[in-house]
Amino acid sequence: MNEKKELQQELELQEFQTPKNQQLEKLQEPNGEISSTGNETSESGISSPPISQNDNSNNENESLNITPNKPFVSMQEELQNLDIENIPIPPTIQTPKIYKNTNNLIHSKNNLSLPISLSQENIVKLDKVDIESNDQVNSNTDNNNNTNNNNNTNNNKNEKIGLRSKIFKSKIFIKIRGWWWHRGISTYIMLFYIALNIGVGVHMFYNMYHSDIFKFLGLSFCFSRTAARLINLNSAVILLPVLRNFLSWLRGTIVNNYIPIDKHLNFHKLCAFMLFCCTIIHCVGHYISFKKINDDVLKIDDGKSVAGDYLNININNFPDEKYLFFKSVPGITGHIMLLILILIVSSSMWRIRRPMFEIFWYVHHLFIPFYILLCFHGYSKILKKDPQSWMWIIAPFILYSIERLIRIARSKKRVILEKAIMHPSKVLELRMKRDNDNFNFKPGQYLYLNCPSIAYHEWHPFTITSAPDDPFISVHINIVGNWTRKLFKLLNPDNKLGLIQEDLKSTQNRGKRRILKIDGPFGAPAENFFKYRNLVLIGAGIGVTPFSSILRHLKNQNDKQTNADENHLKINKIYFIWISRQKNSFQWFTDILAELENDERIDSILEIHIFLTGALELDDYAKIKNAQKCHITNLHSKTLFGRPNFRSIFNQLTQLHQREKIGVFYCGNKALGKNIIKNCNKFNGKNNCHLIFHKENF
């Protein structure tokens, strides 16, 4: 009886500890007995069908030995039929917390913990074990404390890392980082350079202000000498941003992650602006000083000028008052250098450089005689000092000379022109045979093209539109300038559209196949596309050329994948946006776009958005309706009419790519570029999306 009472208590405890989803639903019978209705839950938690009172089948329950042809009985009656030795143990029952460290001592036949009560015998056994293993328990406690301390330390480190990660991925930090990369770092570099000029100028002005010559010539002398020192400084620095081979090498180093090399031309323009302004100040200061010297010399009758006490001049050297202005070494060299700078600055303006690049090219090379004249400008030693300009410019001029020697050596070999294609909208495509050993380039880079038949020393930059894996080198030339028109007439005198390589391969014109020379390749902003898993490529008109090379490269890399599980692209998504006024312009690259659309693996990551901003014809409206493909581009991607709404585009991008980095690449006119970078900066950081803008120097 005692065993039955203990067992009854244990069963009641089991029912109390069993979760609700594993307990049988209990109903109170009228006579006060408990019965089971509905589905019974087995040990495994799987409900079994309800047992009918008239069921004649032999159903065995692992918990209770229920007689088949007998209605449910009370628990007291069932206890009499129980096999105490074979009581099953529900898997959900857990050992009470008091047995946490002694589970190995309390177990049943099936090695599962039982919720047994603490009898006096069990307490004695537990105390004995605790006494015998007191040292071991203390040791385990110390180990646990050390483990907890280590865990706490790791948790603190993880919390710090998590906090740091949250800060770096926060909207404010992304905004600051985006501003720093787009404008901040270049702004600070330019401000630092301006501050350097101010510092050098203030130091020079202070020294001249306290010199003896100041007593005679006054402030005009201080300003002219200060400007002369700044001319030397800017003449030394202005050559560094135009070392194309050096900058191309620098793009492949870690420096490219911290310095905006893409904006090297902006720094070059800043140096040119400082150089031109300092030259004007230098000339005005000397005009005033020369006037003072002439007035002083004309007052002297004994042949000795008062200025001779301060300057290295004599009245015999002054046959007339215009001598210092136009007949002395400083006067002659100074005016020639001033004229050279005026020509260089004026030819660099967009309205002249864009349609007449050859003028810009030739005039810019006048910097060579400018440097030579600068070295001899102070040769007469009027200020009783040796000339110092050569010490400033010797090092950068040597670097530039090495740069030019590399270009000359690399551009001697002529390339074979295999194919020339005249596209609509006055675009000429040239395909040249590639020498894999001497010309290796990256997608997005550019080259310089020379045609000796037109001008032997004239080189023009063009973006490479072929992929590095292609067996040819291709460029697309927009016929807008004098040189490009001459090249077009040379290759296509009959002004035909389409393929014209048959004429090149003919016996009569076979010599034309070797009429071109190339120099390069050179680095460009578009080659940084591999740094991002999400890309936005925006091209306006002929500005699509850098992205043609990128898309062809992705196509070639995808073709190399023999296994569907391989991923040579390492790109998650590409948004290609092409904007043009003329519908015929889209025929330039529709072949590669169609191949990309037909490739399932690339089509899944590539979205093509084409915008036509020009007017449509009446036939276009009829063809647009119910068309399976766009009749303008012959692509599955529909052509959109009008200008793209970049505010909406970037807003959607930040929603689709939350907590991701997107590289935005643009090549086109400045007005559209300002709109893009404005919206790029506006939505940068929204949803923790980092938008990084790269602009091609177009």
UniProtKB/Swiss-Prot annotation:
The chain crosses the membrane at residues 185-205, 230-250, 270-290, 325-345, 356-376, 389-409. Residues 225-375 form the Ferric oxidoreductase domain. Residues 404-528 form the FAD-binding FR-type domain. Its cofactor is FAD. Signal peptide: none annotated. Critical component of the membrane-bound oxidase that generates superoxide. It is the terminal component of a respiratory chain that transfers single electrons from cytoplasmic NADPH across the plasma membrane to molecular oxygen on the exterior. This is Superoxide-generating NADPH oxidase heavy chain subunit B. It comes from Dictyostelium discoideum.
